[in-house]
Every structure is written in structure tokens, then in C-alpha cells.
């Protein structure tokens, strides 16, 4: 398939603006020395080009998308319809408060909903993504300790099964990351946690349920120990879909949390955004909240605010979509978690007789296959199985994560998939298993039916071509 630059023909493009009859000359300094390399192509050819590209990709509208820890659920179209209402799309963030009262009311209502779901006292919608929400929460923790004169607390504890953004966010916030072990059951090793708690502990970052799909049975003890050591507890809300409406993070000892509107609350993934990672916090952290807060038509800033995390209010239209979703679901929001957990356990039970499950117990919203025993016998890897699934019209699960499971396949079906879809996926996994032992090369050479076949990973790493070269 040709690149759009290769389809470009000089002169085929058309100026957007008509010629101006007012003489004008810009200073030379801001002008380009050479013409920009922009493709010149007709509108219908451009439409065909990107439609063809879309057909070469796989999204939630194309088929099953069990990407673990990503909650690739259906994005209801009513969300898009509401977010496209002119009353929302034509707003400008610099408008006077009295002209955007409807938008402010929506933000206030959504904050109230999320506080009810999490048990927290307040929410900032400024963070534009999950990791951005983590960073915001850690800055709140840091501001809290510094306000108390507790400058020695410079360590954030994370488990070895944590999302990679956790230590990255801690580093960005100026903390040293302390990694603790998981126990044989896949949850936090309490003894290792105790050994690393101390006067330098600023907090603990924890996903619960964690990345192997298990809810930590010792969570109350874990948060108590951190608090007794003087630290705060941060809840990574990436897996909130497993417990929404059933467990409130604040009730199990957490002080601050980020949520992914583009996961749990059904707003779209992909395309580089926009995402939204609102950060909720308990009342004692409210004095440090970022951005401006609108109450009764007046904008105020928290007295000890950490400042702005982004411009204005955050990604407002994403909030509209999440708000629509929650109004649609209503008080039965707990059914999301129930069905997500049911679907994951159904798949796990149907596959555990042939695939080694990393932690063979009732899971939450996702489960992890540890393919290492099979790989040692056949040299068919988790990557090979993931590639083979593409030939069945299934997006691969997350692979090689969490790091505590060798040859990991992390599978999250979400609550929006039907039993028929799950059964088709289960059958695909079982057929691939048979091929692993009877025709391993067919799996190792997969996929065979996709527009792009298996790449030469070694060549791509050693001789990358990352940009189009113009003559």
C-alpha cells in the first residue's frame, strides 16, 4: 500500500483561504525557507486512503479485544451523540462563568458521581491520562508531607506486579521507587512490605485487584501498615472496572486514586487521545488540589494548590461521555463489575485444562496464562500465540506482562462481550493449543491472513526506518 506522500501530486491540493486583496508582508524571520512537505491529494482519495488504513487495523468495533489491564469495552454511541451537542462543542474555556453554567453543572455532577463510587471527597479532572493522574496524585502526597515539614519521606513503594507507569510517575514526582515482592499467591508479600516501611516512606502505590487479576485479601492490613509508618496509600484505578459499585477504595484505606475514563467509564481508547485520568482525594488533601474549582459560579484555587496539571479544566468532552455513561447505567453500576468478573472466570475455567494459569484460583476481571511450561517443551512463545490469534479475528491479549509471570498472556474480556463471543475465542485458543503440539511451525509463522504478516524483529531493531525520506 502506498503512503499518502507517494500518492501526492503537486498542484492537486487547493488553498483553503481565498486570495487577500489587502497588501501584507510578514517579516522574514518566521517564514519557512522551504515549502512544507504536505501531501497534495483530492478529498475522495484521502478518504479512501484512510478508510483502507482503518481496514488494516483492529479495534473494538472489529472484534474481540481482550487486552489485559486495558478494559477495551464497548463505547456506546450515545456517548458520542451527547458529546457532539453544539452546546458543548462550541464552548470556550475563557468564557465567563455565567455563560457556561450547564458545563459547570455537568462537571460538578460527575465529580459527585465519582466521589460516590470511590468514597473520596473531591476530584480534579485536569489529568489528561492515567499516568498523568498518577503523577497528580503523587504530587498531592508530596505536598501533604512537605506541608507537615516531613521532607525526609522520599520513597514510594510499588509491588513487582505494578503497572510500569507507577515507578515512572514516582520518578517524575521526585521519589525513589522501592519494589516489594509478590508472594506465592500473587499478592503483596506482607513481610517484605514491613521490611521496607520506615521514616522515608511517602506512600504505597497499589492496583487492587492487581495485574494478575487477584484482589488482595490482606488489603486492610496493607493500608494500615502504611498509615502506621506515616505514609499515604495511592490506588491505581486502572482495574477499577472489577470492583466498581462493590468496593470503594476509600473504605479499604486508600487516600488518593486516579481513574481512567477511557477504561472503566467507556470513553474511547486510541488515536493518541483524548483520554482522561481524573484524580480523586480525601478531604485532608483538598487544600493541595490543582487547578481552579468552580462553586456557586465563582472560581477559586485551593490555598496550597500544587498548581495546574493542564490547561483549563481537562478534556471536557471526554467528561461528557463518561457522564452520559453513568446516567445510562444508573445505580446498577455494580453490574459492570459482576459481569466483567463473570466473563473472565468463564474464560479461565474453559481454558485451564490445557493452558497453565499463573495463579489457579477465582480471578477478578482478568486472568493470566503463564505459557512458560509449554514454551520449554515446544519453543512456541506467548508472542507466537498472540500472533496466531490475529488469524481468528481476535486482538491479542497483553503479553509479557506482568513481569512476575514468564511468557505471560494477560486476558481481560470485559463485561460487554457476549457468551457467544467468549466461546468463539475459547475455541480459537483451543485450536491454537492443538497446533502448538501438532504443527508448531504454523503458530510460529502466524499470522497468515492479515494485511501485514510477521515482521523481522531483528531487522526492525537494528535497521529502523522511522520516517519517510523526501528526495
For each predicted feature, which ranges?
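Conserved phosphate/anionic-ligand binding catalytic regions in large, soluble enzymes, centered on
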Residues: 58-79, 126-134, 265-280, 313-324, ...
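General small-molecule cofactor/ligand-binding pocket signal
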Residues: 124, 178-180, 397
Amino acid at each position: 500500500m502506498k503512503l499518502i506522500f507517494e500518492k501526492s501530486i503537486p498542484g492537486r491540493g487547493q488553498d483553503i483561504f481565498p486570495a487577500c486583496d489587502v497588501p501584507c508582508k510578514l517579516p522574514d524571520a518566521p517564514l519557512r525557507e522551504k515549502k512544507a512537505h504536505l501531501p497534495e491529494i483530492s478529498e475522495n482519495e484521502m478518504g479512501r486512503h484512510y478508510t483502507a488504513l482503518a481496514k488494516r487495523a483492529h479495534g473494538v468495533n472489529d472484534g474481540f479485544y481482550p487486552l489485559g489491564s486495558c478494559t477495551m469495552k464497548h463505547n456506546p454511541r450515545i456517548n458520542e451523540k451527547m458529546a457532539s451537542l453544539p452546546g458543548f462543542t462550541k464552548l470556550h474555556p475563557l468564557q465567563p462563568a455565567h455563560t457556561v453554567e450547564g458545563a459547570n453543572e455537568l462537571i460538578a455532577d460527575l465529580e459527585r458521581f465519582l466521589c460516590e463510587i470511590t468514597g473520596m471527597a473531591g476530584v480534579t479532572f485536569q489529568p489528561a491520562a492515567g499516568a498523568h493522574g498518577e503523577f497528580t496524585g503523587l504530587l498531592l502526597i508530596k505536598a501533604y508531607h512537605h506541608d507537615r515539614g516531613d521532607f525526609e519521606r522520599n520513597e514510594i513503594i510499588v509491588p513487582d506486579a505494578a503497572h510500569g507507569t507507577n515507578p515512572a510517575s514516582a520518578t517524575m514526582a521526585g521519589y525513589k521507587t522501592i519494589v516489594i515482592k509478590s508472594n506465592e499467591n500473587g499478592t503483596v508479600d506482607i513481610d517484605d512490605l514491613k521490611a521496607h516501611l520506615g521514616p522515608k516512606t511517602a506512600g504505597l502505590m497499589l492496583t487492587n485487584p492487581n495485574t494478575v487479576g487477584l484482589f488482595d485479601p490482606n488489603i486492610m492490613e496493607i493500608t494500615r501498615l502504611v498509615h502506621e509508618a506515616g505514609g499515604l496509600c495511592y490506588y491505581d484505578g486502572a482495574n477499577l472496572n472489577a470492583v466498581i459499585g462493590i468496593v470503594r477504595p476509600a473504605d479499604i484505606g486508600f487516600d488518593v486514586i486516579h481513574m481512567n475514563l477511557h477504561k472503566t467509564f467507556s470513553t474511547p481508547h486510541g488515536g493518541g487521545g483524548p483520554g482522561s485520568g481524573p484524580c480523586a482525594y480525601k478531604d485532608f488533601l483538598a487544600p493541595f488540589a490543582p487547578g481552579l474549582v468552580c462553586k456557586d459560579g465563582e472560581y477559586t484555587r485551593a490555598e496550597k494548590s500544587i498548581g495546574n496539571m493542564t490547561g483549563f479544566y481537562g478534556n471536557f468532552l471526554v467528561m461528557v461521555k463518561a457522564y452520559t455513561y453513568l446516567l445510562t447505567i444508573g445505580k446498577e453500576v455494580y453490574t459492570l463489575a459482576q459481569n466483567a468478573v463473570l466473563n473472565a472466570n468463564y474464560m479461565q475455567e474453559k481454558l485451564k485444562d490445557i493452558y497453565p494459569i499463573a495463579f489457579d484460583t477465582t480471578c477478578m476481571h482478568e486472568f493470566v496464562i503463564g505459557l512458560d511450561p509449554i514454551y520449554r517443551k515446544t519453543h512456541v512463545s506467548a508472542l507466537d500465540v498472540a500472533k496466531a490469534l490475529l488469524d481468528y479475528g481476535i486482538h491479542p491479549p497483553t503479553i509479557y506482562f506482568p513481569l512476575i509471570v514468564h511468557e505471560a498472556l494477560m486476558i481481560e474480556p470485559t463485561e460487554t462481550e457476549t457468551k457467544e463471543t467468549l466461546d468463539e475465542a475459547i475455541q480459537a485458543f483451543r485450536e491454537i493449543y492443538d497446533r502448538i503440539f501438532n504443527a508448531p511451525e504454523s503458530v510460529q509463522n502466524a499470522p497468515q491472513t492479515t494485511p501485514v504478516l510477521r515482521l523481522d524483529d531483528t531487522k526492525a531493531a537494528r535497521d529502523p526506518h522511522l520516517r519517510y525520506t523526501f528526495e
